[in-house]
Amino acid sequence: VPLDGFPVSNGHGRVSGGGDPVSRQSNLVIETAHPYTESELRQMLIKEAKKQGKEYGYYFNAVTSGFTYTGEGGSLNSFNVTPLEVYRVYVDGRPDELVRGVDMIGTPLSMFSNITAAGDQPAVFTGMCGAESGWVPVTACSPMIYVSQVETQRRTQSRDLPPVLPAPDVNTSTGGDGDEAIFGAMDEELRRNMAGLSLPGEAKPYYLSYVLTRYRQWQIAGSLGGIFYSTVTPWQSSGGVQVMLGNYQHNSDIQYMGQVAPVQLPAELDGYNIRRGFWETSDLMYRFSLQVMARKIAHLKSNPLPPAEAALPDMQQLPAVTKMVERPRPFEIDLVALEGMVKELSALFKDYKELFNSNVMLVAVEQDNFRLTSENVRLKFPLGLVGLTVSASVRTTDGSTVSDVLAISSLENPVDLPSLEELKKKVTDFADNLMELKETPMIEEYYTGPVLFEEGAASRLFTDNLLSPGRLLALRTMTPARGMLDEQLGRKIMDSRLTVKNYTTLVEYDGTPLFGHYEIDGDGVVPA
């Protein structure tokens, strides 16, 4: 866009992504004709601070993000920079003091007019600069700079309340290793919070539940015989905390499921990090539960429940149980072999020139779950998941795009994958079917009549219509909700010719492994 005095571009327009080029910086090199040593610049700083009657001057050693206002819309040119490492340099000779919470603010004019001297050792910064035309790489090279006058401000303080309990000791040790160390740290923090987590005049929790999950993941994706990424994550951790106030008859739960706060845990687990994660989240959930309990009491006063429902306890007390389920088979990944499989399967699409966006993706997850509650429910159970997904698209004769996905999942272990020849046949059949859809006419008439369902379509018909809230699954809610199962008591909810049974512990059916089996549920209850 031509400007007054600049009728042609000077070649400074930069862009990344799909934006429009904008004048941007590239390389900035700052030099001085009269360089000084760092010691000389420190003496200048101290001398000027004394002259201005200051007890100290600031030394900014490192800064991080900031923002600028560049005069758009009539605003003043100004900046705000967040220093990372700031020291006070005292004029009386005391050692430099590291401080935090300082922001540097000002305008370019005031800053540049107060630059007094520069150093003799340049430093280089390379990073990314973001603006309306995208993120572009930039480099800045500058020596140390002494500025006689800079305005700073105190960073806005957080309004977070201090935690109820002090943080666990950084030197905490639960002894043991592996599962024993994990349960030991969870147990110590759970007992500490059960005993001491309360504010003055407020109730203590009557129930706590801690969940910790350790997991790692493999992902391999390929297209047309090549691998475009193959990743393996290290072991990672996450968790959850549930805090209940009141008692089993009337508690602070308003959701009746899912009232759990996530726990942030580092990948490197030890007793201290486990305890600290659960300590922080227990405090958060305790304060949340206090608020929720007050809201629930007020709501039930204004909206009393029917006597029969009011008599139901809010929570069932469970017996103590310890169950440690070990992985029946090692979860072993041969990354090279699986990459070769993905290459061969994706290469099959080379014979289908009219198919596009074809790819093959393999995802595998190994996971161990730990749960501990104040009711002495202590559980460990493994989980494995392997999924292979094949997808592609084709342009039909009428110009529309048809996409399809072949999913081979619900596998517990990589060894459960079908043979390469079986997979090749499945992928070839998938591609052939997609090519047939290319020439298939679009149905335009409405139809009411017989239909034949098979494979996944048949099972999906039953799961969607029977195993969902309001069907054969009953959920408790604080307020009446339409379409729930309780509205249908005494009414016909399914065809009498159907028999529905829950085979939770069934490992295999008709020679096919079943992925959903388990011996004990997440609460420690054996399935009926």
Predicted regions and their residues:
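Long, low-charge, small-residue-enriched segments that form tightly packed helices used
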Residues: 1-172, 282, 523-528
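Active-site bordering "gate/hinge" segments
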Residues: 1, 94, 108, 117, ...
